């Protein structure tokens, strides 16, 4: 119980398992914060055989999240990445995850042949037509994702308002 799953476009936390069906407390999609909307969705057990089942919490309690931060082409990329990485690494939720993951990664690699060499937050860089896209990638518990993202965005905006970084504006 309480696994976060997705099946047939329904995302939710399993709250009841019965003989013929199971119930999930539905959450919104990633674009809408993946937070509970209060609806209980009854899903027939037959869906397990008809649709792909994504379990967000079976192998690990944490999933990889990505936030896209756009900056202008003339921005100081390395300085901006350093500031954002410091913000992410200082987040209280994210800070403790790599230490907690060591045993989970070892256990999962035995059962699922999953290997992760890098559990710490990282930023990837891509140049688009008129701006630079920084893809900030970090581990987070699915139920804490929105709060963590909110905290990171507030701190990024503070750095922008204090003129320490430049954000791309269309």
Regions found by a protein language model. Give the residues of each.
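Soluble accessory domains appended to multi-pass membrane transport proteins
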Residues: 1-102
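Solvent-exposed, non-transmembrane regulatory segments of membrane-associated proteins
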Residues: 75, 85-86, 93-170
């Amino acid at each position: 119980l309480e696994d976060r799953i997705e099946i047939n476009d329904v995302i939710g936390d399993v709250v009841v398992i019965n003989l013929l069906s199971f119930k999930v407390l539905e959450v919104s999609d990633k674009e809408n914060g993946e937070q509970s909307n209060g609806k209980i969705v009854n899903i027939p057990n037959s869906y397990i055989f008809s649709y792909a089942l994504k379990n967000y919490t079976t192998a690990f309690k944490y999933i990889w999240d990505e936030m896209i931060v756009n900056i202008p082409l003339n921005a100081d990329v390395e300085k901006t990445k350093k500031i954002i990485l410091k913000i992410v690494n200082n987040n209280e939720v994210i800070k403790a995850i790599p230490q907690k993951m060591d045993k989970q990664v070892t256990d999962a690699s035995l059962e699922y042949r999953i290997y992760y060499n890098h559990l710490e937050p990282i930023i990837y860089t891509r140049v688009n037509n008129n701006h630079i896209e920084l893809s900030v990638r970090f581990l987070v518990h699915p139920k804490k994702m929105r709060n963590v993202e909110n905290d990171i965005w507030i701190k990024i905006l503070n750095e922008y308002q204090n003129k320490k970084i430049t954000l791309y504006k269309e």
